[in-house]
Amino acid sequence: MHYEILAGKATIARVETFLHDIDEIAGSSNATIQAIDATKVADRQHIDEAVHQALGSFTDGHNIATNLGVEILLHLSACRQIKKALNFGVHKGDIDVLFVVVGTTKSIERSLQRLNQLIDADPRVIDYSEAKRGQLMQTFNITDKEVKAAGGYHRIPELVRERLALFDAFK
């Protein structure tokens, strides 16, 4: 299985309609598509590690969820509780969004063409920024003391990825 990430900005009037459109694209393209709130993603490495872990869980038969998209959210959030992991999904309003598209090369290409119509592409929404700092610290229970010991706020993405590694090791 291959995957690609599409990132950008969207205005979501109705979450149900947005998710229905994504499900329709996934079904017609024969791909798995997971929409993610980009403000809860530390950086590209965070998303890559979560996707690799989720794919590995399915390969090894150690997956928690029966749906690959939900398994990606579980690993992304470093949390075993599906309800909490779903908080990494999209919400109503103006949002920075990521799509993880998993499938064959052809199914990914078809999906990306259609998903591009739903957003204004902007790959920078994946990158760590000071604007994400508070959200990430709260979401992953990272303390100021921990940040100081790690060497500063610019190390938050590393602390987030550490949470992912621990989640994968002890799930």
List each model region and its residues.
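Ordered, amphipathic secondary-structure segments that act as subunit-interaction surfaces
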Residues: 48-104
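N-terminal interaction modules that seed assembly of large macromolecular complexes
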Residues: 6, 11-67
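Glycine-rich, aromatic-bearing surface loops/beta-hairpins
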Residues: 89-171
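Helical mechanochemical/support elements of P-loop NTPase systems and associated helical scaffolds
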Residues: 14, 18, 78-81, 107, ...
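Low-complexity, flexible helical/coil segments
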Residues: 41-47, 68-73, 132-140
